[in-house]
Structures are given as structure tokens and as C-alpha cells.
């Protein structure tokens, strides 16, 4: 008698009819957890980081390799994007100034710095970069947009392709001596702040729309 994955009998199969007999334990799941699944996103790519002192500067190198998927990251809706954040602080918790390297673009979220904007998910202007497929609506010129059903034009696309590696470097000014703590985070965001804020969607990291994909801390003496 045929049995299912839980060992229970399958009684609706006619002998010799209805297809090829297979061991249920060998049939892979066809579930699609999607972009709300933390475990899926946190096993999508490999991040490697290094930090070293060069005179009065701290040089941070970040490598991201899309080695665990067969498609671009992020994929599906053009609303989705990734934010790479690179922080360097002294022993007093003061942020070191970025002297060379990329910063998160405006659509990473512009907030009120007096209210600790970065802690609320407004990352525009911070050391790091973003990965996204940017579209512009041809009639309204709204960009970035996720309304791909409207007439749109491709502005840029720097998403991480399958098996591709992105390497970026960031140089921070620092005292010639003294400990420096470097923190690197890769955040998956499911919608732009310009859309999420008016709708009241939750954005805080670890919430419904922001998922922490990778994180690493380094200490430079």
C-alpha cells in the first residue's frame, strides 16, 4: 500500500494507474516562502569583510557574492532593494567621517537627523550603497517606482546577478592610534520609504518590510 510522507496510507490510487510510483520522501516541497521569509533571505548570498588601518585612515572592504540563488538579488517586484551599510566608530561611539567611498542614495530614505534618522531606517547619505532596479514612469516622471504596469523606462539596474561578486571599499578618517569598531550590515527592504511612509507600513529593521540579511563586526586596533 502506498504511504504518504507522514506514513499514513494513500487510498485513492488505483493500482497501475495515475502516474509513476515515487517515494514521497524524495519529492521536494513546492512552497514559495517569498521575500517575507528571514531564513530564505539570510541564505541568499555570502558577505566577506575586512578592515585595516592605513596611517590615519581605516580602510573597509566588503565583498558580496550571489552564490546561493539562480537569479538576481533582489528579484521580482522593482520595489525591492538591498542597502549595504558600513559604519566605523571610535571607542566613545563617535562615527568616523567617510573620506572616500559610496553613500546610500536619496531613495534609501531621508529623515530628520535630529530624531536619529538612521535608527528609524532613513539611511540616505550614510556610507554604503544600494542594489536595485530603478524605473521611471514616463508620464509622471516618478522615480524610483514599482508601478511596472505603467509605461516605464529603465534608469539603472545594479542588482547582484547570479554568481556575481560586488566589491566596494570605504575609507574613514581616524586617529593614528586607538581602537575602531567597524559594523557592516546588508538590509533587504521591500518598499521605498516614499511609498511606505504615507501608507504607514512598518520599516524598522527586523520588522515586516526590512530584513537583516547579513551582519558582521570588526575591530581594528
What is the predicted role of each segment?
Residues 1-161, 168-174, 185-221:
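Primarily the internal scaffold of c-type cytochrome electron-transfer domains
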